[in-house]
């Protein structure tokens, strides 16, 4: 079965384990990354925050290629430097992994911003804040915490609101994220009466 059949694609045991590892944080934005910063799994609320948090997306490529139009934003530059630092730290911990040269080589050749961030050598941080300017509920400033999971060599990223305004915006986003797409609502052509969306 494929996604083009109108159903969810087949899920590998590894993907299923990644999803299950996020169940304790199902009510908040949470993302699980592999050593190359590819998204293994993300909660429904995280996916609603940014297309960069969809499973299968490489967060480094997304930041420097897909979201490159935001390079004039100070918040983008700060986030980009942090993403590059995380990749560098992971590379240092996994010397000999052949996946890293491919990512670093591709981005160094195609993104001047990545080359600058990579050469800058900014240290990584296990916590901080990120500014998301164009979510479905407007600009959101969130805190984040990184936790390395040694059993499967992945990194858990948990986001949380920094103030009451962000908390309310995140609540509204959660409500929106729980709604089925318009095409799936009862009474519309092609609607799925069971309301399935496969989200965590």
List where the protein language model places each region.
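Beta-alpha-beta core module
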Residues: 137-161
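Short, acidic/polar N-cap/turn motifs at the starts of alpha helices
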Residues: 127-129, 144
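HTH-adjacent hinge/linker in prokaryotic transcriptional regulators
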Residues: 1-22
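Actinobacteria-biased recognition of intrinsically disordered, low-complexity terminal regions
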Residues: 5-12, 168-171, 175-200
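PAS-family sensory domains
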Residues: 26-116, 120-125, 132-133, 150-152, ...
């Amino acid at each position: 079965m494929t996604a083009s059949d109108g159903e969810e694609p087949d899920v590998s045991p590894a993907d299923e384990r990644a999803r299950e590892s996020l169940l304790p944080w199902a009510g908040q934005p949470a993302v699980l990354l592999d050593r190359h910063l590819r998204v293994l799994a993300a909660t429904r609320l995280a996916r609603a925050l940014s297309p960069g948090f969809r499973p299968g997306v490489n967060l480094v490529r997304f930041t420097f290629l897909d979201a490159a139009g935001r390079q004039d934003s100070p918040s983008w530059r700060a986030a980009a430097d942090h993403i590059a630092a995380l990749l560098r730290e992971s590379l240092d911990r996994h010397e000999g992994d052949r996946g890293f040269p491919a990512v670093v080589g591709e981005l160094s050749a195609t993104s001047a911003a990545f080359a600058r961030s990579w050469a800058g050598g900014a240290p990584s941080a296990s916590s901080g804040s990120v500014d998301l300017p164009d979510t479905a509920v407007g600009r959101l400033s969130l805190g984040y915490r990184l936790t390395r999971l040694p059993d499967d060599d992945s990194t858990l990223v948990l986001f949380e609101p920094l103030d009451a305004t962000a908390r309310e915006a995140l609540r509204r986003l959660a409500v929106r994220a729980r709604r089925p797409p318009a095409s799936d609502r009862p009474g519309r052509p092609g609607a799925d009466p069971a309301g399935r969306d496969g989200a965590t």
